[in-house]
Amino acid sequence: MTVSKSSLSALTLGAIGVVYGDIGTSVLYAVKEVFGSGHVPFTSDNVYGILSIFFWTLTIIVSLKYVTLVLRADNNGEGGLIAMLALASQSVKDKPALRRVLLLVGIFGTCLFYGDGVITPAISVLSAVEGLEVVSPAFNKFVIPLTLLVLFGLFWVQKRGTAGIGKFFGPITVVWFACIAVLGVAQIATHPTVLWAISPYHALSFIWRQPGTSFIILGAVVLCVTGAEALYADLGHFGKKPIRVAWFAVVMPALTLNYFGQGALLLNNPAAVKNPFFLMAPDWALLPLVGLATLATVIASQALISGAFSVTKQVILLGYLPRLKIMHTNVKEVGQIYLPFVNWGLFVTIVLAVMIFKSSSNLASAYGIAVCTDMLITTILTFFVIRYSWKYPLWLCVAATSFFFVVDFAFWASNLLKLFDGGWFPLLIGGAIFILMITWKDGRRLLNDKLRADAIDLNSFLEAVFVSPPVRVEGTAVFLTVEAGTVPNAMLHNLKHNKVLHANNLFVTVHNHEVPWIGMEKRLEIESLGHDCWQVIINYGFKNDPNIPKALQHIKGRGCDLNDMTTSYFLSRDTIVPTIGSGMAQWREKLFSQMHHNASGAADFLRLPNNAVVELGSKIEI
């Protein structure tokens, strides 16, 4: 697809604001954590070596792995771990055991995204507000309250949508990158030889001289690639070219200049290690810089929150979470959604993280394990995509991914050292969500097996009913059923208690597929069952927005004309009764039952009109 120059500029500006906000604010804390750890003495060789490791980490992980390789593995134009998981699992669908392992690995990686979603806003906003301590130590007692206030404001505005202020994200982030580049250049001018650190010689020399220290500091160096996954996750919003142009033309140069500027500052003044980013600025610029940094971290956090909403919706459609209330904050953009449960759940957990760890340095200990695990999983899934989906030779697939796997593994192993210092926190969050997802998936499988075992064949049932047909009333009845070709419980209850049948009857089954989008040309499958009854299958991808009434509008002219005023939707509202020996542990059955009970109603999730829905309940033992 060709992109015009004006469109490319607009998309590149948008990508800078949304895709690179997170990695752009890593300059606030990455260098401080590496040199502030006390593991690295302040010598010119060591500073050059660390800066070189920073530069080549950005080059290998971001420029080569994500921007060059991973961006190519799009799923119908979409990116992100779920899109790659769907692509990888489809490529090995003839290997069911391997497919199940990949699904579990991919879903676990998705769960770790939520752990990262807690740490990243906390460490970003906290590190920005900590700049006040550089202005005056008297501000120290205000850092945590101000951080919590900023975070509360950020989460509170989510329900109102960000369409109005979102247009400012790109320009503000461009100003941020320009600012950090200028700060870096000013310091490099005082010590220009620091630019020699671009040579990989300095990184390799440092690793050769201090292998143990090198391994330890990788756990802090990984902070410089926070948000690298966003490059791939936002592929569908901006496209490959704008993301690549933004990285190579703006983001990478600005980050390099700032990191090298901080290195130059430390060579001139090792005491600046307490907060090298803010100490690069002149005194008169400190307060404005704190304000700009706070804005930049809020924008970075906003992108992550929006990502959490989007990922949760995708996971729900793939059947790994129960339905949650989804509100559309922009009638023109279906992708702009708000999930109250996810929003306030994230907020409470982030507040907990801030209160537990209390500083960006302590939070840095919690960061890394979840992200590095996701990086490893992305590399593994990429191998299966290029091997089994693209059909590349095995040697080429191994060559393309093994190098990145070794690099990712080195960072992951180093971050394991931080497990008991805080790394447990995102793992605990991700592990808890993984248990919820797997329990829901297994519970739904058991429930569907039970429904299938007790199901009545729809065609046979209709033949029997119309031997002595019930009273027909005007209008259309839409019965939602999990399994196509079976009689929905709602219809059985309707016939039993009301003893009537509508003039038109649609038996609707929703199928969610492991592809991002399904267009309208493949949305509906319709089969006439006679007696003014139809079987309708509605197909959605995991990025589609389920809307049953809108989908059924396309049935007009195909044998059945719908009138919104005379259409009723019949749903079954099942109550789960856990039993012993069903295939899941008793505690998981109870957990599934509670999740099922608290799930948002199908009517809201499928956008059914409130005044046209009839819910009929039943109890099901599993």
From Swiss-Prot:
Catalytic activity line of the entry: K(+)(in) + H(+)(in) = K(+)(out) + H(+)(out)
InterPro entries attached to this UniProt entry: K+_transporter (IPR003855), K_trans_C (IPR053952), K_trans_N (IPR053951), Kup (IPR023051)
Topology class, membrane: Multi-pass membrane protein
One Pfam family here: K_trans_C
Cellular component, GO annotation: plasma membrane
UniProt KW keywords: Cell inner membrane, Cell membrane, Ion transport, Membrane, Potassium, Potassium transport, Symport, Transmembrane, Transmembrane helix, Transport
Residues annotated as transmembrane: 11-31, 50-70, 101-121, 137-157, 168-188, 215-235, 247-267, 285-305, 337-357, 366-386, 393-413, 419-439
Subcellular location: Cell inner membrane
Gene Ontology terms, MF aspect: potassium ion transmembrane transporter activity; symporter activity
Function in brief: Transport of potassium into the cell. Likely operates as a K(+):H(+) symporter.
Family named by the database record: Belongs to the HAK/KUP transporter (TC 2.A.72) family.
Descriptive protein name: Probable potassium transport system protein Kup 1
Annotated organism of origin: Albidiferax ferrireducens (strain ATCC BAA-621 / DSM 15236 / T118)
Organism classification: Bacteria, Pseudomonadati, Pseudomonadota, Betaproteobacteria, Burkholderiales
Gene: kup1
